[in-house]
Curated annotation (Swiss-Prot):
FMN binds at residues 125-127, 238-239, 278, 293-297, 319. The gene is aroC. Homotetramer. Residues 38-49 have a biased composition (Basic and acidic residues). The keyword Lyase applies. GO terms for molecular function: chorismate synthase activity; FMN binding. Pfam families: Chorismate_synt (PF01264). This is Chorismate synthase. It comes from Photobacterium profundum (strain SS9). It catalyses: 5-O-(1-carboxyvinyl)-3-phosphoshikimate = chorismate + phosphate. Keywords: Amino-acid biosynthesis, Aromatic amino acid biosynthesis, FAD, Flavoprotein, FMN, Lyase, NADP.
Amino acid sequence: MAGNTIGQLFRVTTFGESHGIALGCIIDGCPPGLSLTEKDMQHDLDRRRPGTSKYTTQRREADEVKILSGVFEGQTTGTSIGLLIENTDQRSKDYSNIQDLFRPGHADYTYHQKYGVRDYRGGGRSSARETAMRVAAGAVAKKYLKQIHGIEVRAYLSQMGAVKIDKVDWEQIEQNAFFCPDADKVDAFDELIRKLKKEGDSIGAKLTVVASNVPVGLGEPVFDRLDADVAHSLMSINAVKGVEIGDGFEVIEQRGSQHRDEMTLDGFKTNHAGGILGGISSGQNIVAHIALKPTSSITVPGETITSKGESAEVITKGRHDPCVGIRAVPIAEAMLAITLMDHLLRHRGQNADVVTTTPKI
């Protein structure tokens, strides 16, 4: 299986399955001298890990990360950073009834057709359990970006089902289990999740991820445009079915006179482009939105087929999220941070000596 690595200069490779012994990743390209301990990654891992609230899957994993290499006396050495998280709460028996079934909406059928064999326990490699290592690697990138360049990457839940937020208060995001920036919508989210759990169903969501204090110049035209790579990294997250940069699909109804981000000596007047122009960062906030589908791991009976070519009914047992968008918030942050880290190192390598007299706004 290829496709387990993302990035060019800051490269992240993950491995492991949902019910395997452990998950792991290798980070190549992290500059030396960055102070780093397991604690630096644990905060974001705790935000993502299962079993932390009544609104998410009750699989209980400590998700305690171990640094295997690349760090000496609390500092990165510039060599490969090896990270490992052990799986401790697998309940593979929950999946024994579906080992020959293809769950609709999941990767069971496509994995089986592509490889001729699949790990049916919790989805194996296709499970969102894999994203724990992305979050760990993303925490390294987030620390470097913030500590060395003052870049901050944050995300929040902006919509669940038909319930949309009306305002953004960054102080509220960590005050509730939904990563919701609008305190007035928390009860509505709570009511929706309770209803879904009672019905055995699930719902989709929309997340917004923002990077602030990003310098001008990140991005490599034409095929490695920053927005193209941001879309690629966010689209690689499990259950993501759509990505918007800036105003996204709203531009369809906008006019050029409305959409263009006019400039003054004091700065840009608007940010419809989401902080990226011509595939290169403009110095404004980078803003992206992702749409996540409702999980198909539900107890509502559904029609499917077996690997032996028989018709069957499927009811997914096990422990699952009624809305995968909740725990995807730190994952979205991680993927944007990894992409920005990679492009920052690439920009530094090629353009560190570029001098321009053009004022920065």
